[in-house]
């Protein structure tokens, strides 16, 4: 199956259907009385760059390591809080761009034959219904080649509706938060947004309406009244993250799209999208029962529903991560976020979440969609040099459990099971080697080799001997987001040489050697990397017969914890 379809409009944001071109996104509700599109642009974030590096961490690193080795959990926790937590504690967070309202006045109780769908083959949201004897259609796309969101409206002659553009979260009803102004002209609405916080990006969003020959567009206040049997709404947006003048950037994008009619816009969009989507096909059975997707999820046992889910994941990958000028990878919510205060900042969590986003990329033959991840990684490597040097006295670069649009690599928040974990960047670096294994792109590998090398420099300096002097281990360490009871029954979080750390370090040192071999590099770090890899501890089986999560056979505080980080190497 290649469609998600429903017989009712979305009741909230979670039920709306997503479109995206990697940078611009919208959630389409499909309502008949008042249609709503929740807009996002991937560089609309609260606040600008900030230096949050804990300045006294290195001074207290020996004490922290000693407390961890002595299993003095309270002292380790105290030192981590006062010397290793960043100030301010939070990185920047992602925000909505705005909301488009289209007031049709079609009361739901008088609507018949309602159908709403996301066509995964064409990356198009379609809404159709009958109202008072007339048939109404809307089609929505997010075009990558033309940098535009487009809404096509088909209706009986003389149909009238009102278009508004504002900055409103239906989720929180926070009208006009960080909204500078909205102004309408004869056929366009322009909105300026300052997301808030010091040195934040500024955004410009332009909505333009074009009608069929008999149609009219009338400005009333900051609204546009459209009267036509066919109309096309184009939406463009840029921010100061990519354009010094976002008004000019958005206007240029709009001007380019005006050179294409509806058919050309749709054809260009579909051709581009299908060049990626059509690379693979998964079918697990014949087409399942012809029932709406929400009902199918509840009642169907047809394996084809799994194939649909797989196709949807590929659709989301293509729609949320594309190459371009200062491209950003997909964040915790892809590019779709309705909240001015999203969960976990809707940023880039790198103790598993960002990596998970890209697990389908190479195996689904969508390696190009992974490239924005490496654009961010290059910037992280630059900012991470200070993190490595100031916090740990190490060469190279390091990043902790999260990052943001500005590639912030300092510890984030004040939650011990996640905050003090400087191997987030190392895990991301393994994607370099995996990407090359699929693509065999030597130019890419050459570009990213210095990033990988910097990561290896950090790891070689960060590793210390264990108490026996036999093995090299990490300290401080955690098993991300998990905690334990030690052999005395005391609760702890910080540890030495968690299993996931050792697995990541071993994989990175091995990948570094393989990359150097592919590039013909005789790097001076190679001998040190080989020696360190040979001195890493082996994996250990617990008395219960399980792979240990920690170097010592500790007991999980929460058995069956959602993070199974010690299975990383699998």
Predicted regions and their residues:
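Aromatic-residue-lined binding/catalytic grooves and analogous aromatic/hydrophobic interfacial grooves
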Residues: 1-417, 423, 434-436, 453, ...
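A generic "alpha-helical surface" signal
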Residues: 304-307, 446, 450, 503
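Active-site phosphate/pyrophosphate-handling residues
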Residues: 355, 427, 503
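Extended, hydrophobic alpha-helical segments in both membrane/secreted and soluble proteins
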Residues: 424-435, 444-461
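Acidic/histidine-rich catalytic neighborhood
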Residues: 454, 458-515
């Amino acid at each position: 199956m290649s469609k998600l379809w429903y017989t009712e409009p979305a009741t909230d944001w979670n039920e709306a259907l997503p479109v995206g071109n990697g940078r611009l996104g919208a959630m389409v509700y499909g309502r008949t009385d008042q249609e709503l599109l929740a807009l996002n642009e991937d560089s609309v974030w609260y606040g600008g760059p900030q230096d949050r590096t804990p300045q006294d961490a290195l001074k207290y690193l020996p004490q922290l390591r000693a407390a961890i080795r002595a299993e003095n959990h309270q002292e380790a926790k105290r030192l981590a809080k006062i010397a290793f937590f960043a100030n301010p504690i939070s990185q920047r967070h992602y925000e909505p761009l705005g909301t488009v309202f289209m007031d049709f006045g079609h009361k739901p109780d008088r609507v018949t034959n309602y159908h709403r769908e996301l066509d995964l083959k064409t990356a198009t949201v379609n809404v159709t219904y009958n109202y008072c004897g007339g048939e109404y259609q809307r089609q929505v796309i997010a075009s990558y080649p033309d940098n535009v969101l487009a809404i096509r409206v088909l209706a009986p002659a003389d149909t009238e509706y009102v278009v508004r553009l504002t900055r409103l979260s239906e989720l929180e009803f926070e009208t006009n938060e960080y909204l500078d102004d909205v102004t309408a002209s004869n056929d366009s609405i322009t909105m300026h947004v300052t997301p808030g916080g010091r040195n934040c990006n500024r955004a410009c969003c332009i909505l333009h309406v074009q009608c069929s020959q008999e149609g009219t567009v009338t400005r009333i206040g900051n609204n546009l009244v459209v009267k036509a049997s066919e109309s096309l709404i184009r939406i463009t947006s840029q921010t100061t993250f990519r354009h010094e003048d976002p008004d000019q950037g958005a206007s240029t994008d709009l001007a380019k799209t005006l050179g294409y009619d509806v058919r050309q816009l749709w054809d260009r969009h579909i051709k581009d999208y299908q060049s990626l989507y059509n690379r693979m096909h998964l079918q697990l059975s014949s087409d399942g029962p012809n029932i709406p997707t929400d009902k199918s999820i509840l009642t169907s046992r047809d394996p084809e529903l799994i194939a649909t889910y797989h196709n949807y994941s590929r659709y989301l990958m293509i729609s949320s991560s594309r190459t371009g000028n200062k491209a950003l990878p997909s964040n915790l919510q892809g590019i779709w976020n309705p909240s001015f205060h999203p969960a976990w900042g809707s940023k880039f969590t790198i103790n598993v979440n960002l990596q998970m986003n890209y697990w389908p990329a190479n195996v689904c033959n969508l390696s190009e969609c992974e490239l924005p991840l490496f654009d961010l990684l290059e910037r992280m490597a630059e900012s991470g040099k200070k993190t490595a040097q100031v916090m740990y006295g190490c060469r190279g670069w390091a990043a902790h459990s999260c990052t943001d649009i500005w590639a912030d690599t300092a510890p984030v928040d004040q939650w011990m099971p996640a905050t003090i974990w400087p191997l987030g960047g190392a895990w991301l670096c393994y994607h370099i080697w995996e990407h090359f294994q699929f693509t065999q792109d030597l130019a890419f590998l050459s570009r990213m080799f210095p990033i990988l090398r910097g990561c290896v420099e950090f790891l070689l300096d960060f590793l210390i001997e264990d108490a026996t002097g036999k093995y090299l281990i990490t300290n401080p360490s955690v098993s991300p987001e998990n905690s334990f009871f030690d052999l005395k029954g005391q609760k702890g979080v910080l540890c030495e040489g968690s299993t996931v750390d050792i697995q990541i370090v071993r994989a990175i040192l091995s990948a570094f050697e393989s990359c150097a071999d592919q590039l013909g590099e005789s790097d001076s770090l190679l001998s040190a990397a080989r020696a360190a890899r040979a001195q890493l501890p082996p994996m250990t089986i617990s008395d219960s017969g399980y792979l240990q999560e920690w170097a010592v056979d500790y007991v999980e505080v929460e058995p069956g914890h959602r993070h199974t980080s010690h299975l990383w190497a699998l």
